[in-house]
Amino acid sequence: MDYFVVIIGITIFVPMHTFYCREINNDIALLDESESKHLSQVLRLNEGDIVKIIDGLGMEWEGIVQQLNKKKTQIRLTNILRKESIAPLCSIAICPTKNIDRFEYFLEKATEIGICNIYPILTKRSERKAINIERLDKIILNATKQSGNLFLPILHPLISFKDFFEEIDLASFTFKAMGHCVENKLRKSLNSTYKSGQNALFLVGPEGDFTDDEIDKAIIEGFESVVLGDSRLRVETAGIVACAQINFLNFKI
């Protein structure tokens, strides 16, 4: 919970800042260097201040800053605030856009809505061949903390379209679909094909769309061809819409 402080009859809302922690032992959380610097040097919190801690796996605690250190700050966890056992049932394989700002926008919004895995893929018509994973991970982490979500999405390494089908465990997904603009391929609406509770994997192609061979390959691998509406969508918009529709059908938004 956050706090209200009353000063001379005036009530002031004081939100608790959220920090992500991988290293939690019993009731002690040790923040890494990046989160420690943010706590002490950016937010200028002090020992005794109350914060929120998330582990990215569905848990959120209230804690007290116990030992300040710019490389490893110690937080004593006082009580559990929230606990969720089911991660978002949405994963998206998507081609990074030529303009990286648009891809970063997708990552931010999909994280806010709720997403489990993001697989950047390279197709024949891809215009961007490399991404900065470290920078993109920071965008995802910030969006996770800002949105209040308890699950930190996993951004996987960039992978070719061919290797994607060979290396990803597609059997772990109970619903697989792809969006494309090829009108002579049979397509159904996502709303009519997806059923609540299915673990979904959605494929989004590049600005120039998937090739016919890529579409055929995906269909052979069990992907359904779907449409997301009547409009022709940008890559990042298609990813966000697919994510939103799947979460909506699972009553998450």
Language-model regions: role of each:
Residues 22-23, 33-34, 56, 96, ...:
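Fold-independent oxyanion-binding glycine-rich loops
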Residues 95, 129, 207, 231, ...:
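Glycine- and other small-residue-rich loops at beta-strand/loop junctions that grip anionic moieties
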Residues 51, 75, 152-157, 225:
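Generic structural signal for residues in well-ordered beta-strands
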Residues 212-253:
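Structured adenosyl-cofactor binding patch, chiefly the S-adenosyl-L-methionine
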